[in-house]
Each structure stands twice: as structure tokens, then as C-alpha cells.
Amino acid sequence: MRYVVQTFIGAALIWALVACQSGPSQQFIQKVTAEQNDLKVSADQAKAAAEKAASLKKSLEDLKAELGKNWEKVEKDKDLSAQYQTLTQQIMDLEGQANTISSEVQAVLSGAQAFVDGLAQQKKKDEELDKEWGAIREKVSDAAGKLSELGEKLSTLEGEVGNFAETVKGKFAQAKK
């Protein structure tokens, strides 16, 4: 009988501790930590977008170097010169957007890291913390949407730069020889 009473009291104490637990559950902490790792993909995407913009810029610089003195002929051709200026401006704009979005993503990820680091000290319940975490996820989702849109613009611009390079090479590359 004594064993039954001790077991019952022990079980009641454990139940009371769990029921009165303050702070997030271990499952919530694990869920948030796993989701945070998923959010880090956005940082990689932002870096890739910035690198793609830089590679487009380099493509135009390489074209200019490849043509050498014949580049002057491109500059004198009103249509090609205007197209080059437009492409250069678009690349600079998208490069700026990539850097801005990258900064936004880094700021959100820093906030997510601070949230995760502070979870163990929190006294709030899962439901309250889930609202805060949801706001962080929403910011990352917004940035991911911007990154997707930027990726589409960069892909389109990549095609335009390729077409421009083909046109210029077709017109002026033979004259270099």
C-alpha cells in the first residue's frame, strides 16, 4: 500500500510540475530551431542573387575588353550604345536591390537567432511565443518573395545581356582581326 501511495504522490508531483511549467516546451524549442535552419536558405539565395548581378556586370566588362578598340564603334552606334547604357543601369539597380534584400534577410535572421537564443530564458507559453515566431517567419517569407522576384528579373536580364553580346560580337568582332 505504501508503494502505491508513493507512486501516486510522485505521479501527481510530476503532473503538477508539467502543468505549471513556465516557458516554452522542449518540442516548441526544437520546432523553432529546425525552422530557423530552414530560414537560413534565404541568406544563401540573397548571396546568389548578388553574385548573379555581379556576373552580369562582369559579362559586359569582358565583352568590352574582348572587342578592344572596336568598342568605340559600339559607343558610336546609337542603338547599341543606348542598349548598353540601359543594361548597365538595370544591372546596377538589381545589384542594389540584391544588396538591400540581403541586408533585410540578415537583419531578420539576426532577430531569429536572438529569439532562439533567448527561448530557454522565456517565461511565456508556446502560444504567445508562436505568435512572435510567426512574425519573424512572415518577415522572412516577405524577403523570400522579393528574392524570387529579383531572381526572375536577373534571369530576364541575363538573356538580354546574352543577346546584346551576340549582336555586338556579330557586328564588330570580325573587324578586330
Functional labels for PLM-detected ranges:
Residues 11, 18, 61-62, 68, ...:
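Intrinsically disordered and other compositionally biased segments
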Residues 70-126, 130:
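Short, solvent-exposed, charged loop/turn and helix-capping segments
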Residues 57-60, 64-67, 109-116, 165:
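Extended amphipathic alpha-helical scaffold segments
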Residues 32-52, 57, 118-177:
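C-terminal amphipathic alpha-helix
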Residues 1-21:
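Sec-dependent bacterial lipoprotein signal peptides
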